[in-house]
Amino acid sequence: MAEQVLVGDVGGTNARLALCSLQDGSLSHIKNYSGAEYPSLEAVIRVYLEETAAKVSSACIAIACPITGDWVAMTNHTWAFSQSEMQQNLGLQHLSIINDFTAISMAIPALKDEDKIQFGGEAAQAGKPIAVYGAGTGLGVAHLVHSGEAWMSLPGEGGHVDFAPNSTEEVMVLEALREELGHVSAERLLSGPGLVNIYRGLVLSDDRVPENLQPKDVTERALADEDIDCRRALSLFCVLMGRFGGNLALNLGTFGGVYIAGGIVPRFLEFFKASGFRVAFEDKGRFHSYLEPIPVFLITHEQPGLLGSGAYLRQKLGYKL
């Protein structure tokens, strides 16, 4: 039996853990745990190892927060821990704690054709830079570059760059939201809560009072064609996803492709396909022709965070991806 390592994908609500084969990166024994039911990440890992009777010497856990040193404090959870202490407590020879979008970016080289849907552009160019972003609870961003024999993820907090409007409607939304929020980042519009902000901004810019809606309300009403404001909001969301993706492509010349990680887009996939997303992606004036061949993909793999955590660790331990 091939040696296995522990991999994880931890968000503000759930912790997903699995075993990953060092030989081929395949995943097994995938389990999901509610973070609210455990006092710490270490406690969840101990339960998982006991339930699976797994013996591992190495682990890689992806977490939805910035990783800047030994101490890790989750953004949307009370869990906080020292990486070195947890490694020692669990008796691991190696422990890597990485950002969730570092993991998702590292999953991309392992994706098969059936794990993604293409939106325009030509074939991805092998070995060229890649960008990945995803709108969920927040807006995650990472880049991936090939260096020598290895893939290198370039994580950051790109979701918090300034929102840059590019139409009269977008300027009006920005002005309405600025009065409520102060600084308006891209994440304030490109996320689940951001979809509601777009709806609010559109209604407020018309000098009307918005309803108190949740993201799913906006999506459901838009798809049912029951509410013109919600439909406008969802349409603008798709356009802004395109503009933001085009900006990422320009930043690093991502002829290896721009990837959208799951998040909320799959909930309205057909609407997204028919939206102004791709036109907005290429809408860069003189650089339209530069962006035209760059493909955009939606990741449909169910566990890209786990897959990427495994890929990150396998490469770190000397395995070629």
UniProtKB/Swiss-Prot annotation:
Keyword Kinase found: yes
Catalytic activity: D-glucose + ATP = D-glucose 6-phosphate + ADP + H(+)
Location(s) in or outside the cell: Cytoplasm
Classification via InterPro entries: ATPase_NBD, Bacterial_glucokinase, Glucokinase
Record keywords: ATP-binding, Cytoplasm, Glycolysis, Kinase, Nucleotide-binding, Transferase
Chief location: cytoplasm
GO terms (BP aspect): glycolytic process
Annotated GO CC locations: cytosol
Binding site for ATP: G8, D9, V10, G11, G12, T13
Source organism superkingdom: Bacteria
SUPFAM superfamilies given in the database record: Actin-like ATPase domain
Main enzyme class: transferase
This enzyme's EC code(s): 2.7.1.2
A Pfam match: Glucokinase
One MF term in the entry's GO annotations: D-glucose binding
Key word NADP present: no
Family the UniProt entry places it in: Belongs to the bacterial glucokinase family.
Protein name: Glucokinase
Organism of this sequence: Tolumonas auensis (strain DSM 9187 / NBRC 110442 / TA 4)
